């Protein structure tokens, strides 16, 4: 309440000069800006001989660990060319939340706190093939091809 009292003590002319910058700063701090957790991910699943594998289940997992407490997933099946495409995964969050959420998470979880973006895909669902995994590294182009081996 000290700030409110200080502002109330200012003369009317000074208050008129301050209201627009204060309003602008408040809007900038609380406006939910969009960030991409993981860009669109286009994957081709092939076997160890280089042939496309149709009918494989592919699950994409993603989460912005700094801003979300739970992750998300989406499931698709490869087409006859062994391809699946997942759209970009955006999240909206204010600058205030982006500053406060990681701090609170670190205070709560200590050095075990996971921060930042995470995404991966898992290729599975056919007994003839082993499971395949690819992990997205923020700032890089997602892996476009996953090679799975025949089960032995």
Regions from the PLM with identified roles:
Residues 66-92:
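Short, acidic Ser/Thr/Gly-rich low-complexity loop/linker segments typical of extracellular
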Residues 2-24:
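N-terminal Sec-pathway targeting helices
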Residues 56-62, 120-123:
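Extended low-complexity, serine/threonine- and proline-enriched intrinsically disordered segments
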Residues 53-54, 85:
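Generic structural signal for well-ordered beta-strand positions
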Residues 92-142:
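A short, solvent-exposed loop/turn motif at the edges and junctions
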Residues 16-40, 44-51, 59, 64, ...:
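Beta-strand-rich domain onsets/edges
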Residues 12-14, 74-83, 107-112:
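Short, solvent-exposed cationic patches
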Residues 41, 56, 74:
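Residue-level detector of short, conserved catalytic/binding motifs and their immediate flanks
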């Amino acid at each position: 309440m000290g700030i409110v009292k200080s502002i109330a003590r200012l003369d009317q002319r000074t208050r008129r000069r301050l209201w627009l910058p204060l309003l602008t700063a408040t809007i900038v701090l609380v406006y939910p800006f969009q960030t991409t957790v993981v860009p669109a991910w286009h994957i081709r699943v092939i076997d160890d001989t280089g042939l496309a594998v149709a009918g494989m289940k592919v699950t994409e997992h993603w989460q912005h660990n700094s801003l979300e407490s739970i992750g998300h997933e989406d499931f698709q099946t490869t087409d006859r060319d062994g391809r699946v495409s997942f759209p970009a995964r955006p999240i909206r969050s204010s600058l205030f939340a982006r500053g406060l959420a990681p701090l609170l998470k670190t205070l709560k979880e200590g050095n075990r706190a996971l921060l930042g973006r995470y995404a991966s895909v898992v290729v599975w669902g056919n007994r003839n093939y082993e499971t395949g995994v690819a992990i997205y590294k923020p700032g890089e182009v997602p892996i476009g091809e996953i090679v799975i081996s025949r089960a032995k």
